[in-house]
Amino acid sequence: MSSSTDDAGTTTHSLQEFKLFETQSNFYMIGWDGSGVYRVLKIDRLDPSELNISQDSTHYTKKECYELLKRIHEGNKATGGLKLVTLCYGIIGFVKFLGPYYMLLITERRHIGDLFGHSVYAVSKSEIVALHNSTVQCNFANSRDENRYKRLLCMVDLTKDFFFSYSYNVMRSYQKNVCNYETGHNLYEKMFVWNEFLTRGIRHHLRNTLWTVALVYGFFKQASLSESGKDFKITLIARRSRHNAGTRYLKRGVNRNGDVANDVETEQIVSEDVPEDHPMQISSVVQNRGSIPLFWSQETSRLNLKPDIVLSKKEPNYEATRLHFDNLVERYGNPIIILNLIKTKERRPRESILREEFVNAIDFINKDLPEENRLRFLHWDLHKHFRSKTKNVLALLCKVATCALMLTDLFYYQVTPAMTIEDSMSLSSSSDADTGDISPHTSSDDDNGDHDSLEKKSSRSKNIAYGKCDVKPPRLQSGVLRTNCIDCLDRTNVAQYAYGWAALGQQLHVLGIRDVPAIELDDPLAISLMGLYERMGDTLAHQYGGSAAHNKVFSERRGQWRAATQSQEFLRTLQRYYNNAYMDADKQDAINIFLGTFQPEQGMPAIWELRSNSLSNGRNGEMNIGKDERFLVKRCLSDGDFLHESCTPLSAMSSNHESMPQKGFSAPLQHVSHILSESSSDIPVSNDVALSRCTPSMPRKQLFGDVQKVHRFGSDQVYFGGEEDMSSVSNFVDIEWLSSENPCENALFDRSSELTRNLTAETSSTENSVNGVGQSAPTISESGSSSSKGKEPMGTKIREDFPDSFKEWVAYGEALCH
């Protein structure tokens, strides 16, 4: 995004500041890039139902631009002349409902960080400007439906969790930016650019992206830390997919294209903290979360906090599920590692229904894949393990994370002083640059095919750059860990923190900041990282579930008073329930309007008229929706801070907003004390969660050694362990070792150190590396001291006629709703 090719074939730096002027017949936007070059964009106002945009190919100086504006003013004096409308920082896009077009602008921005010398911004204020003027008649400009559509658009609060950069491709991971650099319009077609639809018209007209910004929705946070006197910066980025996006109970599972709800890519970048933010060594690692890729749903209920889960469609060949995993391979390469955290056994089957079908789907898909490309999985009932008072779940999750890291590796890149970071971003072929040729029917969405070229481009780059600048070859991440629970919020966030914790030690080790790739759980670095992941979890939960995440584990680690934690969890359960039951329908409509999933047409039903129709005719991608077809609202998952309930973020809109339903919910609250909310955390708090004083490691026996084959759900599943414990099933990690009580062996990290020492050597087969560890690495046990003892009952005698859940709450002080 640092440059774009205009219609004259000239490469121009990104425009970053703009002024919008108006006459009675046209808008004129003046943009400049900070280097003294000014450009002019003209937008016609006489036919507001059509988007007529033209760009002046002339590159003006400041003086020439001033003279041009003066001439325009003189020529329009009879109709009021040229007037300044606003200063702005980029065009978000254009949208049309039933009447005229509207232009969305960023009028205020705030700096939130830097990536390798490139500034990253968030939106502080936005404005919507109607293209028509008061003298032009527009039949639908002030109609009731038109105003309601504008109010829906205004519900999208662009000041919450949207971010962008003029010169760095924040919608792509650092590895993709280095190994397959892209510019221009292709970037807007990625799955993480939320204003792709809104910018489609102007990009098609101008065949460049000089005037627009690509908005990413999710989370961005940086922290500067120090270890042994060495400063480094950690950046945590979450990118939410625009595909199958929506609110929690209205978007669940997978659609027919293989897109899952709540699909979020999380990237953890660690780099040297140096002046001017030009680090010489950088490491990044990517993980993924997403809804279970099956056709399933849950009805929103105002009387039931725990609605039933329904498998709405069973595919004999699991085509949509297969498409989803094919897409993950195209995005990240092999192997795909699935960490499935949902429940195994329930009094009334809910999550377990999906677990069984998910196991079937993975097994069916694996039968058609070569052994080296099969899906790796760990079905691990996190709720059950958290309820066990003898297990340190974070340490166990770190074991899983370390095994996954050994299979996928991480990305490491070194730049010498002879090579700038901009040079490193251009290692791939120049043919990837934007040519300016845009076809409305072509798409490079989702970075499909990018990973196939990583090795080839990296190899070519060695010959081009490494020989001249003495740059060490990079380490490449190939594959990804995909984590899910039911909502992919609370349990998933704990698991993602464990993965980030394991990765951070290895990233600091490969950067030479730490001598060993192991970080204890009570290390200040782990605590700082926990704060970042907790904040990310809250943000993503607000976007998807309507409340902050259930963070009982993190609260316990901070030493928060248990009663305060219980109250906090209870209030978050109520907040999530209320938003899901009463607010999500309008929020879903707002998302669909913003993303272009629904496009209003005159004479056709409005989006709010289709809600009941959608409930009776289709759910979760079962309805056939072509690219040019109108949309029928679907039920599924996601919510967000991104939706502004007061409907004011687009400040130019002054219409009176319709009030949201304000029905009381006293009746449902009567059931809260005995109905467990599926939205609440399924993670009981236990002090032993905080007791990891040592780092996980490799088992004594070979990781892929002799395993027991168990016939399960009609197919052969790899099962580790002596008993048929259905809470834990895996084909890539030894469950018996995972649950063992001696998690302090060092072989895993010994192997990691060996990989670091051999950084410049060619990367060997990932699976062979793992097998080699199991065969050769001895295990050494350490005694890990604990900062506190395991949790004990309070000693209160409880009557036997009370329910088990109540007795457990009295004995262990846990929340009734969990």
From Swiss-Prot:
Keywords of the record: Hydrolase, Membrane, Vacuole
Compartment(s): Vacuole membrane
Membrane-topology descriptor: Peripheral membrane protein
Chain ranges for the short sequence motif Phosphatase catalytic core as given in the UniProt record: 482-493
Tissue-level expression: Ubiquitous with a higher level of expression in young seedlings than in other tissues.
Regions crossing the membrane: none
Cofactor(s) in the UniProt record: Mg(2+)
GO annotation, cellular component aspect: vacuolar membrane
Chemical reaction(s) catalysed: a 1,2-diacyl-sn-glycero-3-phospho-(1D-myo-inositol-3,5-bisphosphate) + H2O = a 1,2-diacyl-sn-glycero-3-phospho-(1D-myo-inositol-3-phosphate) + phosphate
Molecular function GO labels: phosphatidylinositol-3,5-bisphosphate 5-phosphatase activity
Ranges annotated as biased composition (Polar residues): 759-780
Compositionally biased intervals (Basic and acidic residues): 789-800
Domain SAC residues, every copy: 153-546
InterPro entries named in the record: Fig4-like (IPR043573), SAC_dom (IPR002013)
Pfam families: Syja_N
EC number: 3.1.3.-
Disordered: annotated segments: 426-459, 759-800
The protein's enzyme class: hydrolase
A biological-process GO annotation: phosphatidylinositol dephosphorylation
Function of the molecule: The PI(3,5)P2 regulatory complex regulates both the synthesis and turnover of phosphatidylinositol 3,5-bisphosphate (PtdIns(3,5)P2).
Subunit structure, interactors included: Component of the PI(3,5)P2 regulatory complex at least composed of ATG18, SAC/FIG4, FAB1 and VAC14.
Notes concerning its domains: The phosphatase catalytic core motif (or RXNCXDCLDRTN motif) from the SAC domain is found in metal-independent protein phosphatases and inositol polyphosphate phosphatases.
Protein name, entry field: Phosphoinositide phosphatase SAC3
Species assigned in the record: Arabidopsis thaliana
Encoding gene, per UniProt annotation: SAC3
